Amino acid sequence: MRIVWKLFGFSRRLLQVEWCHPSESILLFTLVPRLRKAPSVFLLGQRQGLSTMPEIEASVRDSELFSPPSDVRGMRELDRTAFKKTVSIPVLKARKEVVNRLMRALRRVALQRPGIKRVIEDPKDEDSRLIMLDPYRMLTADSFDKAELGVLKELDVSPQLSQYNLELTYENFKSEEILKAVLPEGQDVTSGFSRVGHIAHLNLRDHQLPFKHLIGQVMVDKNPGITSAVNKTSNIDNTYRNFQMEVLCGEENMLTKVRENNYTYEFDFSKVYWNPRLSTEHGRITELLNPGDVLFDVFAGVGPFAIPAARKNCTVFANDLNPESHKWLLHNCKLNKVDQKVKVFNMDGKDFIQGPVREELMLRLGLSAEAKPSVHIVMNLPAKAIEFLSVFRSLLDGQPCSTELLPTVHCYCFSKDSDPAKDVRQQAEAVLGVSLETSSSVHLVRNVAPNKEMLCITFQIPTATLYRNQSLSLQNDQEPPLKRQKTGDPFSGEPQIASDS
């Protein structure tokens, strides 16, 4: 690192100041493009400024000193004994009774490394302790500043430094350090995952697959509470929203329990859809609801929208086509003590809208009470939910309700467009046959992949779309409205309430 700065021909200290002479500023910023090409040397952070040199150097130094041995490169089967390494650390000897006071004074120069004790016993003197110091900050006794030397003198501690051979083992390295040392140089390292109870859910790339079992073992070893690591082997199934997975390490048991926003959910992760990255979104929708509101959850999964809404004293109708999701939805309603507040259905989304949703809307929107609850419809099936909006066209008969009582839809979707908000609005407009330009909002949920966003478009269903007579009078030139299949029952699919059975 020092060589890099020397090659560029100016002092590292230049970047450590917050203000510099104009001539120095010109030199600094002409070097920015070149410095950005030097890995781990120069960073432009999200603060839109220059990262301070202490931050950069600390990271580089740490990776140099505490990197695993080079001969683990290419390891396919984890051998923990191969990670042994000895490093030389400067230490300061002090009487054990003054160690606590001394440590407070030496925070600047003490060794900062998770999993390594900064104070150890002196093998040659049981009444003394050895304080481990930062090997880059503490080269000699002259490296102490004036205040630190004053404390040493006050406590009668000699500033003389000694060297201690510290043995590092597999347990002392972080997961990203291990994987960076093992995987081929220059390739992306997977150290993150989605946690689903005791399960670490990884989504490995092709170049990481030869090391998949080692990666899974490292994830289990380095993350307390994780006892199983799995990798997705196929895309999400569009029918039931689950995916094929391979157990990389640990137990095969996929029955798990998670806590999200103070609610508990239990399910078989191999058979249902669950995404812990949607926790904030589940909470956001819940915040939009008021006690007494009505929520229709068209693709309810195991209940992350339905259950919080029910606990907020909303009337909830929750549906999912997947029989496993339906089973665990019933179970979780009971588990969270809202089984009497949620009506659960196991139907196709279109049938659910044309059946239970239609029947309830006809009933509720036709009431004459002055204070009517708001109606919300959540459609969390990003790959296909936009298509289901067509079911709302000419869904209701009779006299239209007032505008403020029209149901509010929260529809999730994906976009790869450069203007994703505009894109999803246009998609929804194309399906509904009306403009949503001034009557909708689009919320960015999360980035799914490079150039792929997940969004939620929220809007009230226009009267011209929702009511049959309005649709016919305003859109005679469009396709005939969808007709609900007639059955002997008011709607196909009976609601179920969670029970002991």
UniProtKB/Swiss-Prot annotation:
Monomer. It is an enzyme of class 2 (transferase). Residues 474-501 are annotated as: Disordered. Belongs to the class I-like SAM-binding methyltransferase superfamily. TRM5/TYW2 family. InterPro entries: MeTrfase_TRM5/TYW2, SAM-dependent_MTases_sf, TRM5-TYW2-like_MTfase, TRM5/TYW2-like_N, tRNA_Gua_MeTrfase_euk. Pfam families: TRM5-TYW2_MTfase, TYW2_N_2. One of its GO terms (molecular function) is tRNA (guanine(37)-N1)-methyltransferase activity. It catalyses: guanosine(37) in tRNA + S-adenosyl-L-methionine = N(1)-methylguanosine(37) in tRNA + S-adenosyl-L-homocysteine + H(+). Keywords: Cytoplasm, Methyltransferase, Mitochondrion, Nucleus, S-adenosyl-L-methionine, Transferase, tRNA processing. This is tRNA (guanine(37)-N(1))-methyltransferase. HAMAP family: TRM5 (MF_03152). It comes from Mus musculus. The lineage of its organism: Eukaryota, Metazoa, Chordata, Craniata, Vertebrata. It comes from the Eukaryota. It is found in: Mitochondrion matrix; Nucleus; Cytoplasm. Transmembrane segments: none annotated. Involved in mitochondrial tRNA methylation. Specifically methylates the N1 position of guanosine-37 in various tRNAs. Methylation is not dependent on the nature of the nucleoside 5' of the target nucleoside. This is the first step in the biosynthesis of wybutosine (yW), a modified base adjacent to the anticodon of tRNAs and required for accurate decoding. Its EC number is 2.1.1.228.
